[in-house]
C-alpha cells in the first residue's frame, strides 16, 4: 500500500494550490480527482478567462455564519501574493471592473500554472479516480480507491460544493465531514439567477436580453449596484447574482432601475425645457427603449406629454422605476449557480490551519466549507488563501 504525507481530494483551484504548496514545502502529496482533467470549473470561469482574484478583497465580502473565520487566511495569503505568482508565470491580466482581474488570454493559463506548481512540488496527480471509502486509525487515513488502496498522515477535502453538477460537483465533502462527526450547515445555491412567477414573467417576456444599470436591495438591507439582465426565465446579471446570496425563499427584493438618476428632478427639468415632449421619449433618454415600451404597455407609464403629467402620476412613476418590489419564484438552482452557500460549519475548523478541531489530520478548504464570497474573484481568492493556510499547516507537521 502506497503511503503519502497528505492526500488532497479535488483537483480544483483550492486542491491544486494546496497540493502544490505542500509539495514544495517537502511533503509527499497525492492529489485525486474523479474528472478527466484538473481545474474544470476554473476553465469555465470568467467567460473562459478566469476572474482569478479581486483587488478589493476584504472579509466583509464573504458570507458565513462565523463572519470572522475568513480573516486570518485572507490576511496571510492576499490577492497581491497570488497576483505575484501569476506574474512569475508570465500571465498577462487586466482589471475589468470593480477590481475584478482576468487573464488577457485564457483560463487555461491558470490551470497550467497550477499544474506546473504541482509538478514543481513533486505532487502525484491521479485523475479519473473515485474515492470509495475513507477510514481513520492511529496511523492516519486509509483510502479505498477504484483499483488501489493508499494511506496518508493527513487528508485534505477540496471537493467543492454542489454548484454546476455538470462539472463534477457532488456532496462528497459533506459526507466525509458527517462521517467524522463534523456539523454541515444547510446548503443552497448562491450567485445564481432568479426565476419569476408566471404572471410577472409573461408581462416581462419582451425584455429578454435587455440589460440595465440597477441597485438591488435585499430584505436585510444589503445593496448591490451593478447591471440587471432580463432573461426568458427571470432576472440575472451581476446585481441579481450578488443579491441572490442574501435572499431567502419568500422574500422580496427592491429594484431601482435608475440608480444614477434623480428621476423626479430629471422630469422637472425636462418639463421646463421640453413641455410637449412625450413622457415615453423622455424616459427613453435614461432607460432602454424596450423597457419603456414594455412598461407603457403594462400601464405603468402614462401615454402623455410632460406638461400633461400630473404630480400624482409622477410620484407613482418614480416609485415604480426606483422602488420596484419583486418577489422571485426561486432561483435557477445549482445547475447555473456559481457557488454553494452553507457547507461544513467553520466552528468545527481552525481558522489558522483549516484542520478539524476534533479530528487530527483532517482538513477542509475552498467552497466545501461555509465561506462564500461575492461575485468577482472573491471565491477564487478564498480558494487560494484557505489552501495556503492548510499547506502551511501540512508543512509544519514534518
Model-derived regions: residue spans:
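N-terminal Rossmann-like FAD-binding beta1-loop-alpha1 element of flavoenzymes
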Residues: 4-31, 390-395
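An anion/pyrophosphate-binding glycine-rich loop and adjacent beta-alpha core
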Residues: 36-38, 43-44, 52-59, 92, ...
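Glycine-rich active-site loop/strand segments that organize a redox cofactor
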Residues: 49-95
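A glycine-rich dinucleotide-binding beta-alpha-beta segment and adjacent secondary-structure elements
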Residues: 127, 293-372
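Glycine-rich FAD pyrophosphate-binding loop
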Residues: 23-47
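Feature captures the FAD/FMN-dependent oxidoreductase FAD-binding
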Residues: 76-154
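Short hydrophobic core segments
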Residues: 7-9, 32, 131, 150-166, ...
